[in-house]
């Protein structure tokens, strides 16, 4: 740790950076270990407007332009300074100091510089008499090994910008990864690759006498450069987003598991093994020095201390010597007594005794909470102690701010905070930050650059909007104060001419006086007697638990606790903070002392100390001591020495140095040393075999056997620090504090906390912190210990190369090539999942064609290698981003191929595909999509429609595409609709598609006749065009007989209805006329005259009588035009009257003039008009007239396709459908699909088509959706008609349970069969027929569940049968024995589980369960592949399905009578919950309902009991968790109840009544809940239960189910219900054994 005396104040540091680098380098904030704004490091932003730099930033993993500059005084870093000066001299002599560009230059003769032939780096030393480096590891050689990529440059802005550009664009370690990629591909690789792999594997170099390779270990922070000035060196490092300290303080859940903890430690040990191999100790390992990336990859920092070899390292230079002369900040903080060398306990004791001011103590607390000076997002916070209403006086409460309440509470009021807490989704009173960036920048507005104000406050700078005086500033914000208002008068003075100075209160004459009075107020007796309350609210126990609720201080919690955070609120204390000694108001009043005197200085008033009673003083002392002992975690210790002044370059030899091999240490457990590391060698090291958890005995044997005596005391100190960090990762608090460390060193007594560690971790930690440093293991020995599993080693070896500073393309090549060689399969699914976070971000960046192929390979390999849940959580978000890209993307087209999608289906199932991918496939067919992407998407949709089934296809493909009519749907989108019609058959076209299209046409016609804005009318015309094109394509597929039948249904021909409209665009009318003639020619002369011509009479009459209004000049122009050019029916018409020219001559040719004149009374007027304007005259020649307007569509000629869409989709190639024509704004060409070769042009209707029972959804479809602009994914509420579409007799007795497969094509039912035995039947919904049965049950089956996409089914009849639904063979059988009940007593949730059960707690749904040892219900945990089953004695049994064995038993629920009740319902929270990206998350809790009406909540992750409450007055029939915080329950007490678990673990329900009988079950679709009671169904909305909090009840209106065809009611009682969300259907089972499909 750098001493404060060698630090700059942040003002001087800012000025120094500006002086060295100009204003192109923006100072963000300083970095310091001190509570005061002094330090030698700063976070800066490097600005560069060059296009190359901007483009490079976008292609790099880290797009941030922030870097850390650390100033190192040359007189404190002598070795490093001489090393740098050597290359500065060489640079002057003409030698290049650019970064290396080839493997052959990667040696330690230069720090990234090419060596000259006469360099003798083996014997180079720095020349310092005190330098202890010697031998093969010389001082300069060690520096080069630690800084292999650092470029040495002059200190200037341009050089720093070059370093930044090199980091983002040139990527100095790209060559190493490229060489490794060549090795994986079986090509020749350089020596650097071998050296790098030896570095990771811990192997010695092949030639020990060769020059040491200059390679950075991936877990050491990269020093990009060393910039030199006259007196300083400036090291340049990329800024890491987090430190381990950040994670432990603000987002501990980001370290998700024990594996992640061990992985972090393994990385640190790997870096230490490299350092120790160089005979270098780190010396300062602590969480704040461990940097983490977004993916939690670790970097260990180096070079943060002066070295021992410098002549002035031990001299004490004053702070004034390095700051500028007359530094203002030095005067501000000169009298403060705090120091970074003192721990919290010392500062607390000084403050409590009055030796430290309130201001100083609060600064210490800010530092402990992680707050940073100058960082506007996380600035130190101070309390407002006065309200500025008047000048405060010590003898009055007037003018003082109430420190017992938060500023947020004072500003908002209790009523508003109570409302916020009770109504918001995440209950809270206050924000998650007591001092926002907006408030800080507003406070400091006079001193900050305008660019900062525009970014943080408002983009448009308005100086008058900023508070002008302190009173307004205080009233304006609910945030707390900043330290500057207590110490720095400059904050009032404006640097901006347009903004006035901040006015001080009237009782202060100047800013200086205000600062003095404000500071005095902070130190006054009034504040000293109350400041502990503010500490409790801001840093203490009132931040959580019941105390936070009482104080109205519940903070807004993070919605994603597993996401790493670098800022947040840290709770320092967990019990009330003691009042300052002598300032207790209660004791002051009890003693009846004199009124308070004015407080002088920072000490305690002598008069007050005299009158303190001895017992009261002792009581306060004991209270403070107990508080201090309880907060020892604020004094962490990670080292055995207090003052660490040695350099990391300090040589660390053991007593047996001469006996130690100076090369990098090898390992005894390596699988042999290969003379050449090959791909097979790497795969062998990465292979993960099935292994059990670490055995404690094996670890104990390792500790006894590991080699000792080859490490130095300094290196052993690093191992001690590693042990402390490992323990803290598990304990979430430091292992040692100052007291416990002293006790341990003195007597060897280990801290009590160590007993809380898992036994294997405890063994490792005890070995690392061994009191005798000679007995501590080396880093290499720890890496090879059995503590680290093969999964950790494999993941590190695979991921480490990806952390090199290489280009995204190179990293992608490495990952894809390695994955293609089978590394993911070799590593196993778990390691592949852990490594996905390092690989998948590479595929979502802009890629070239070649890179797209690599990205496709990588996605495909991860899809095959990961578990379904992992694919859903990790791979699908990347696929979603790719499918959402606009324009052409080679990768997107690849992902839309059938081979990939089917593989995805097999992994994640169709339900997840339909939720997360299918809507994005459809989105590629509208809004001017790329033609190739649209073609690929259309082929995919066509081929998937048959497998998805008619109901899903209609609701998830056809309706969304129709909703895009008029909104930019492309030709391929319409082609999808037509080809799906061809694929699913003529009955599907007639029954499903034609009614939908008719609905669209009628809706558009009705809308066009209304007075609407122009965009609406324009949309109507576009939608009609799309609809008519689709209609024509479908009509071409049906027979003439069916076509005539559709025309003779009594409905007006749609085309004629369109032609009758006067508000539609002419191109729509022209297309309708052309289409109508095509239909007429198909049905023939007689049918046209019989059915079509009468409907045209009104239209012809309109044309005849409107001819007189035609303008004469217009007629003349028409005559001239028609005389010069013959009119063609495809030529765009100019007016509505031109339809006469399209229709009348064509009908004359088709019907003959005589029949036409008979059907058209106004024939004379029309023929006169045609003769006059178009020179048309009927001439009978036995054939058609010379102006025969034949409207038959011209079929697109070309080679016929040899494959049906199904074959096209299933192929491995990337076939796309041929275009069926183009549409544009001026001309609409009719699209009729050419029949596939070998098939008939028209489809013949089948008698027994699949899904024949499925009705048209048009009756449930809201036409208004068509005109609404928005995402069709945002569906409206389901309109349930309570109509039975089809039914079948499934069982002889009652149908007890049913479950539907995720593709909604198969349903399993269980019920009572003859002999009161149970059976399970498998039904295909397409034909509504039973295809197989399972009859191995001896009792009635009460519950069934589909376990996975592999076809396994579990069924419960008191025992659990797991069987294969394809073969019907039993896989596993599980049952409970009486002896198993004794296990439940060990469950943490059970107090007494040995009581007899209630054998009569059964009801109609569970008849047959009379034995307490029988299983009653079950719930599948997909994430864990486990089954939770309830028992008759109220316990929960876990079953591992993969291993086929029973796991733990959680105890049952005891009721007042001493009996237990059976478990009647189970569910888990989280498994159905989705992230914002749609990915499922693992369940975090389990809810169990009981026959007694009780409900219990269990913590699934911690294996503990959470809560229990009386949920119902009767048997709980079902539990469902629609969201992570919601629980819905039903009961035989006739109610359903909704429980919001966020507000309390014993929540108040939202009660839903209305049923007259017990609710036997329910099912949820979206926000709608469909419940069943007897023979009634009831519907209510979850949205109302959340939006209308004041309404405590919602009533259900029961409905009867009606038979769709017969119209009669369903009289049988309903027993179970299941919703088919994608099909918009639901299925009910009844006591009469029937299975009924309803809508």
Swiss-Prot record:
Keywords: Kinase, Repeat, Transferase, WD repeat
WD repeats by residue range: 1290-1333, 1336-1373, 1465-1499, 1511-1549, 1609-1639
Annotated tissue distribution: Weakly expressed in the cotyledons of germinating seedlings. Restricted to the vascular tissues of cotyledons. Detected in root tips, apical meristem, young flower buds and receptacles.
UniProt feature, compositional bias: Low complexity: 1377-1398
Gene Ontology process terms (BP): defense response to bacterium; protein targeting to vacuole
One of the record's GO cellular component terms: Cul4-RING E3 ubiquitin ligase complex
Full protein name: Protein GFS12
UniProt GO molecular function: ATP binding; protein kinase activity
Annotated segments matching region Disordered: 1377-1399
UniProt keyword Phosphoprotein, yes or no: no
Signal peptide extent: none
InterPro entries reported in the protein's UniProt record: BEACH_dom, BEACH_dom_sf, Kinase-like_dom_sf, Prot_kinase_dom, Tyr_kinase_AS, WD40/YVTN_repeat-like_dom_sf, WD40_repeat_CS, WD40_repeat_dom_sf
Start and end residues of each BEACH domain: 336-608
GN (gene name): GFS12
Complex formation: Interacts (via protein kinase 2 domain) with BCHC1 (via PH-BEACH domain).
Function: May act predominantly to suppress BCHC1, which itself is a negative factor in protein storage vacuole (PSV) trafficking regulation and plant effector triggered immunity (ETI). Required for ETI, but not for cell death.
Protein kinase domain sequence ranges: 206-294, 715-788
Phenotype of the disrupted gene, per the record: No visible phenotype. Accumulation of unprocessed 12S globulin in the seeds.
Family: Belongs to the protein kinase superfamily. Tyr protein kinase family.
First-level EC class: transferase
EC number(s) on file: 2.7.10.-
């Amino acid at each position: 740790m750098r001493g404060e005396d060698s630090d700059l104040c942040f003002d001087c540091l800012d000025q120094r950076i500006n002086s060295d680098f100009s204003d192109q380098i923006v100072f963000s904030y300083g970095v310091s270990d001190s509570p005061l704004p002094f330090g030698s490091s700063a976070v800066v932003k490097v600005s560069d407007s060059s296009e190359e730099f901007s483009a490079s930033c976008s292609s790099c993993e880290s797009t941030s332009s922030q870097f850390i500059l650390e100033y190192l005084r040359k007189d404190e870093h002598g070795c490093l300074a001489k090393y740098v000066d050597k290359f500065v001299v060489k640079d002057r002599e003409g030698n290049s100091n650019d970064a290396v560009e080839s493997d052959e230059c990667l040696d330690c003769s230069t720090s990234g510089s090419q060596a000259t032939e006469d360099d003798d780096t083996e014997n180079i030393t720095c020349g310092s008499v005190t330098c202890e480096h010697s031998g093969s590891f010389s001082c300069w050689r060690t520096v080069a090994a630690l800084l292999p990529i650092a470029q040495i440059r002059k200190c200037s802005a341009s050089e720093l910008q070059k370093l930044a550009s090199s980091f983002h664009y040139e990527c100095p370690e790209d060559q190493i990864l490229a060489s490794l990629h060549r090795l994986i591909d079986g090509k020749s690789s350089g020596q650097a690759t071998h050296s790098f792999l030896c570095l990771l594997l811990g192997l010695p170099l092949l030639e020990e006498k060769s020059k040491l390779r200059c390679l950075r270990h991936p877990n050491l922070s990269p020093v990009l450069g060393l910039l030199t000035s006259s007196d300083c060196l400036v090291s340049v490092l990329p800024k890491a987003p987090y430190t381990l300290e950040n994670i432990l303080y603000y987002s501990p859940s980001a370290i998700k598991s024990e594996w992640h903890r061990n992985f972090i430690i393994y990385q640190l040990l790997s870096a230490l093994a490299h350092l120790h191999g160089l005979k270098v100790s780190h010396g300062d390992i602590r969480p704040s020095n461990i940097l983490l990336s977004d993916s939690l990859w670790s970097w260990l920092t180096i070079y943060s201390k002066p070295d021992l070899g410098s002549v002035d390292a031990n001299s004490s230079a004053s702070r004034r010597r390095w700051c500028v002369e007359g530094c203002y900040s030095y005067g501000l903080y000169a009298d403060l007594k705090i120091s970074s060398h003192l721990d919290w306990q010392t500062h607390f004791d000084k403050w409590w005794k009055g030796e430290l001011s309130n201001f100083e103590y609060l600064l210490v607390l800010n530092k402990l909470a992680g707050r940073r000076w100058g960082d506007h997002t996380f600035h130190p916070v101070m309390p407002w102690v006065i309200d500025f209403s008047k000048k405060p006086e010590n003898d009055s409460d007037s003018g003082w701010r109430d420190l017992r309440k938060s500023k947020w509470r004072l500003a908002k009021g209790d009523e508003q905070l109570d409302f916020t807490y009770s109504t918001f989704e995440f209950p809270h009173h206050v924000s998650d930050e007591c001092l926002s960036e907006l408030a800080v920048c507003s406070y400091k507005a006079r001193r900050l650059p305008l660019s900062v104000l525009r970014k943080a406050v408002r983009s448009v700078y308005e100086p008058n909007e900023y508070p002008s005086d302190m009173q307004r500033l205080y009233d304006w914000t609910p945030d707390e104060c900043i330290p500057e208002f207590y110490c720095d008068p400059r904050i009032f003075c404006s640097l901006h001419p347009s903004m006035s100075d901040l006015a001080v209160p009237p009782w202060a004459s100047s800013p200086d006086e205000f600062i003095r009075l404000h500071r005095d107020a902070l130190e006054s007796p009034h504040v000293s007697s109350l400041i502990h309350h503010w500490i409790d609210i801001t840093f203490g126990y009132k931040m959580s638990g019941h105390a936070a609720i009482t104080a109205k201080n519940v903070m807004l919690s993070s919605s994603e606790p597993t996401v790493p955070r670098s800022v947040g609120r840290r709770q320092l204390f967990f019990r009330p903070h003691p009042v300052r000694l002598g300032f207790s108001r209660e004791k002051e009043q009890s003693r009846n002392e004199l009124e308070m005197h004015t407080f002088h200085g920072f000490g305690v008033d002598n008069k007050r100390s005299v009158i303190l009673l001895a017992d009261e003083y002792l009581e306060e002392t004991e209270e403070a001591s107990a508080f201090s002992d309880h907060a020892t975690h604020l004094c962490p210790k990670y080292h055995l020495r207090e003052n660490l002044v040695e350099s990391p370059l300090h040589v660390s030899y053991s007593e047996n140095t001469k006996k130690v091999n100076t090369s990098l240490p090898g390992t005894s457990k390596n699988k042999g040393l290969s003379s050449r590391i090959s791909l097979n060698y790497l795969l062998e090291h990465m292979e993960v075999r099935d292994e059990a958890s670490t055995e404690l005995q094996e670890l104990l044997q390792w500790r006894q056997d590991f080699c000792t005596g080859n490490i130095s005391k300094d290196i052993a100190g690093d191992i001690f620090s590693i042990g402390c960090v490992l323990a803290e990762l598990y304990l979430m608090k430091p292992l040692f504090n100052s007291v416990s460390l002293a006790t341990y060193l003195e007597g060897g007594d280990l801290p009590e906390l160590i007993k809380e560690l898992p036994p294997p971790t405890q063994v490792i930690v005890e070995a690392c912190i061994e009191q005798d440093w000679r007995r501590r293991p080396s880093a290499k020995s720890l890496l090879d210990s059995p503590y680290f599993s093969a999964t950790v080693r494999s993941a590190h070896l695979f991921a480490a190369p990806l952390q090199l500073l290489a280009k995204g393309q190179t990293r992608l090549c490495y990952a894809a090539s390695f994955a293609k060689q089978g590394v993911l399969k070799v590593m196993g699914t778990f390691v592949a999942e852990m490594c996905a976070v390092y690989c998948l971000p590479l595929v979502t960046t802009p890629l070239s064609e070649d890179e797209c192929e690599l990205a496709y390979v990588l996605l495909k390999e991860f899809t095959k290698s990961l578990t379904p849940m992992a694919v859903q959580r990790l791979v699908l978000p990347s696929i979603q981003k790719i499918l959402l890209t606009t324009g052409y993307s080679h990768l997107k087209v690849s992902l839309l191929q059938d081979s990939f999608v089917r593989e995805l289906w097999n992994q994640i199932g169709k339900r997840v595909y339909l939720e997360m991918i299918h809507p994005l496939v459809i989105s590629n067919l509208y809004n001017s999509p790329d033609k190739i992407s649209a073609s690929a998407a259309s082929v995919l949709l066509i081929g998937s429609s048959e497998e998805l089934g008619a109901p899903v296809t209609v609701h998830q493909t056809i309706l969304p595409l129709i909703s895009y009519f008029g909104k930019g749907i492309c030709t391929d989108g319409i082609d999808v609709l037509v080809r799906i019609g061809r694929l699913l058959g003529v009955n599907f076209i007639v029954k499903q598609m034609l009614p939908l299209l008719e609905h669209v046409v009628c809706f558009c016609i009705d809308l066009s006749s209304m007075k609407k804005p122009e965009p609406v009318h324009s949309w109507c015309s576009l939608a009609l065009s799309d609809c008519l094109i689709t209609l024509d394509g479908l009509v071409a597929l049906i027979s003439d007989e069916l076509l005539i039948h559709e025309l003779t249904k009594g409905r007006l021909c749609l085309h004629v209805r369109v032609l009758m409209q006067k508000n539609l665009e002419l191109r729509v009318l022209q297309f309708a006329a052309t289409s109508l003639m095509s239909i007429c020619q198909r049905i023939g002369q007689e049918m046209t005259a019989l059915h079509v011509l009468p409907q045209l009479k009104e239209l012809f009459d309109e044309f005849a009588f409107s001819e007189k209004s035609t303008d004469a000049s217009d007629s003349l122009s028409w005559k001239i035009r028609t005389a010069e050019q013959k009119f063609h029916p495809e030529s765009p018409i100019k007016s509505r009257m031109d339809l006469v020219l399209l229709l009348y001559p064509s009908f004359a040719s088709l019907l003959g003039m005589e029949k036409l004149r008979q059907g058209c009374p106004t024939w004379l007027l029309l023929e006169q008009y045609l003769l006059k304007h178009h020179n048309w005259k009927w001439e009978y020649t036995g054939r058609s007239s010379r102006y025969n307007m034949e409207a038959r569509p011209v079929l697109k000629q070309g080679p016929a396709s040899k494959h049906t869409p199904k074959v096209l989709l299933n192929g491995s190639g990337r076939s796309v459908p041929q275009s069926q024509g183009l549409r544009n704004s001026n001309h609409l060409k009719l699209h009729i699909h050419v029949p596939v070769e070998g098939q008939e042009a028209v489809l013949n209707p089948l008698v027994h088509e699949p899904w024949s029972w499925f009705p048209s959804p048009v009756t449930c479809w809201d036409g208004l959706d068509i005109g609404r602009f928005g995402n069709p994914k945002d569906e409206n509420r389901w309109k349930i008609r309570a109509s039975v579409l089809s039914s079948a007799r499934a069982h002889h007795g009652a149908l007890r349970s049913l479950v539907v497969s995720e593709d909604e094509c198969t349903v399993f039912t269980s019920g009572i069969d003859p002999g009161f035995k149970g059976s399970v039947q498998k039904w295909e919904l397409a034909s509504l027929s039973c295809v197989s049965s399972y009859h191995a049950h001896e009792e009635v089956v009460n519950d069934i569940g589909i376990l996975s996409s592999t076809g396994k089914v579990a069924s419960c009849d008191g025992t659990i049968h797991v069987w294969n639904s394809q073969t019907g063979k039993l896989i596993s059988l599980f049952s409970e024995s009486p002896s198993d009940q004794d296990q439940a007593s060990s469950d943490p949730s059970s107090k007494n589980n040995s009581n007899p059960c209630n054998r009569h707690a059964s009801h109609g749904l569970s008849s047959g369960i009379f034995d307490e040892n029988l299983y009653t219900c079950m719930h599948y945990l997909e994430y864990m592949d486990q089954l939770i089953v309830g028992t008759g004695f109220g316990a929960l049994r876990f079953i591992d399905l993969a291993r086929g064995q029973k796991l733990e038993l959680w105890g049952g629920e005891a009721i007042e009578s001493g009996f237990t009740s059976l478990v009647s319902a189970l569910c888990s929270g989280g498994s159905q919950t989705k992230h914002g990206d749609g990915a499922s998350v693992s369940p975090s809790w389990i809810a169990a309902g009981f026959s007694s009406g009780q409900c219990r909540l269990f913590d699934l992750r911690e294996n503990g009991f959470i809560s229990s409450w009386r949920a119902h007055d009767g048997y709980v029939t079902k539990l469902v968790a629609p969201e992570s915080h919601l629980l819905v329950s039903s009961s035989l007490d006739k109610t359903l109840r909704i429980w919001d678990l966020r507000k309390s673990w014993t929540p108040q329900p939202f009660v839903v009544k209305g049923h007259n009988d017990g609710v036997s079950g329910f099912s949820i679709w979206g926000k709608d809940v469909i419940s069943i009671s007897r023979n009634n169904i009831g519907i209510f909305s979850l949205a109302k239960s959340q939006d209308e909090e004041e309404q405590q009840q919602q009533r259900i209106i029961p409905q009867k189910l009606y038979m769709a065809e017969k119209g009669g009611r369903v009289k049988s009682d309903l027993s179970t219900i299941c919703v088919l969300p994608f099909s918009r259907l639901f299925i009910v089972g009844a006591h009469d054994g029937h299975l009924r499909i309803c809508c």
